[in-house]
Amino acid sequence: MNSTIEQLKHRIAVASKRKPAELVIKNAEVLNVFTGDWKKTDVAIADGYIAGLGNYEGLQTVDATGKKIVPGLINGHIHIESTMLTPREFSKVMLKHGVTTAITDPHEIANVAGTDGLEYMLNASDALPMNIFVNMPSSVPATQFEHNGAQLDAKDISSYFQNPNVLGLAEVMDFPSVANADQKMLEKIVSTIQHGGIIDGHAAGLSKEDLNIYMAAGIRNDHESVSAQEGKDRLEAGMYLMIREGTVAKDLEALLPIINDKNARRCIFVTDDMLLDDLVENGDIDHIIRKAIQLGLDPVMAYQMATLNTAECFGLRELGAVAPGYIADFLILNDENQVDIHQVYKNGKCVVDEGEINQSYFAASLTYDATTLPKPRIQQLKASDFSIDLTDDYCNIIEIVPNKIITNHVCERVEVKEGKFVPSVDKDQLLIAVVERHKGLGYIGKGIVKGFKMKEGAIATSVAHDSHNFVVVGTSEEEMLSAIKKVEQLDGGLVVTKRKQVKAHLALPIGGLMSDKDYLDAYEEVLKLNHVAVENGIPSNFNPFLTLSFLTLPVIPTLKVTDQGLFDFKTFSHINVEVEEK
């Protein structure tokens, strides 16, 4: 926030007690995230800032006897589109869970709609009672191994650095381009550095030596650590370690053992990708704090990682602490270990009281027009388009890892009839296909997947990272056709079929990524989708839609599928479904 001289004069007058504060919170214990101490003190607020701690009088007072005060929580890396909500609805859920600031990477909508998508996200995030900061997508398209809807170069993104809500460059996923000093990639990095921006990393599967390349290029954090050793490597390299606990990627338990008094201030919490049902039911950063404390992390350390550390990582100098001169974003808690939220304050105003959102603070925000965003375009399909022709029965198969975005590459015998793969629910060998949907080019990439344990039907979605083509997994070609046709009819969405009939769906008309519904209405439809998916045999211990949406992301190990076919992360190339060497 930019302050005028008059505002500074007013805050100084309140701090020096020459003027009363607009609001004083009394009798609470306040967490000092700088020292790690709790102290009973008044919190005086003026012009949306904390003017002072101590003994203060105000025009309005709130008695918080028996309560604790901590800074508003900050999510250091999230893709809003993965929640399937507009920024307006997203902010409502996040505020209820104490998250007053989020740093988002809109590369999902950018891969669909380019700069039109960026404009939508920036405008739709404006005038909300929550800070939504944006990092410019670095890799649109993510790779050359798939078709997406747009391309962004350094010139496209550099103009956005003038926007105060744009912090820097989002996760640099294309490591080969960095390592090979690709001109276009370096132009984006240099432009970001010249504008004083932060550069996020994406170091999935990288060795300790490879991290040197990222650091040399100015990349300063990473959220892809899935093991204790990877976490140590990043901290030793000088990176901020983003500890991710989202809907599919759950790395907290693996990384928590390496956190200690010496390195904790270089660690922050992120969720990356969260689906709506998970967000509504379990929360966001508040959920990570609860779980971390249950696993033995010191509560003060957990709150530092969820607030001050993240603010410092991104250069947000007025956020992350309950201290004089900081923006008055804070939570009043009934219990700090459970993150039991009594009230949420944003800019010194109570925006959530006992779980109820104050809707008046959303009056100034707009439901931003998304009709200019492109609609899906696919060629006319038939069931046989999903068949896989085979010359051998020994095949490369994608094996999902529940609650992870990585996969295993396994090789198994499959049933072949008349030269075509026959799906088997007994062997858990199902068809998966990716249908290009941006320009109607007709590309369909196909493969075999196991781990869904589906006994009948199909599930399909237009959320397919990062190019967001249509992806479908099913027990037969006919089931898959029914599901994809419905996704097309909805202009994008989530679909479950059973006996070739659509049994549940959620329309995502905003770029094929986001619902235009109220978050509670969308949530109810998601519950129905999950229920039918379980009826079809899919286990309930992981989210099949988010899992499916990451089977198309070739920059994550190990075996994936794009609209151009099966993709091997180790060789960074497409491979045949049949195993070429036995």
Swiss-Prot record:
GO terms for biological process: adenine catabolic process. Keywords: Hydrolase, Manganese. It is an enzyme of class 3 (hydrolase). GO terms for molecular function: adenine deaminase activity. Its EC number is 3.5.4.2. Its cofactor is Mn(2+). InterPro entries: Adenine_deam, Adenine_deam_C, Amidohydro-rel, Metal-dep_hydrolase_composite, Metal_Hydrolase. SUPFAM superfamilies: Composite domain of metallo-dependent hydrolases, Metallo-dependent hydrolases. The keyword Cell inner membrane does not apply. It catalyses: adenine + H2O + H(+) = hypoxanthine + NH4(+). It comes from the Bacteria. HAMAP family: Adenine_deamin (MF_01518). This is Adenine deaminase.
